[in-house]
């Protein structure tokens, strides 16, 4: 299981800019809204396996979705011992292979806005998302740069309909 925080940017104009927010994360959320036929974007939102969405504060729904996700078969994603390559195993689907770089832990002091004078603790906050290429169902290997100190990386295999086919992280 790989948990990542894609911080959206549409609240940035309300007195404080989230240092992890990005337009690409906002676009990703809007793509999920379209694919999952939600109709609108909102926060806090959790997407599980690219196929289920729920309000992030609904603990019972989140735990049920995570339990169901663990039972599903995934395409193997494994990192080499030297941390410089990742292999996507064989499977019956096709998808995009994505590389995510994220901050393991960060503390942010909020100066203004709704959370003024609060200190926020973030874990696995996405810093960048890039494409490694396409996966057509056959085993495939990609060269990668290992994570820097305080950083993690995740490799996701995602179908065109948004479903996660495989994932792994390296810290």
Where are these regions (language model features)?
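Conserved helix-turn-beta segment immediately C-terminal to the redox Cys motif
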Residues: 1-6
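Residues that line or immediately flank small-molecule/substrate-binding pockets and catalytic motifs
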Residues: 8, 50
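A short acidic, helix-capping loop that chelates divalent metal ions and anchors anionic groups
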Residues: 11-16
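Short, conserved sequence motifs used for protein processing/export or organelle targeting and
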Residues: 17-42, 51-171
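Ligand-binding face of N-terminal immunoglobulin V-set domains in extracellular IgSF glycoproteins
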Residues: 46
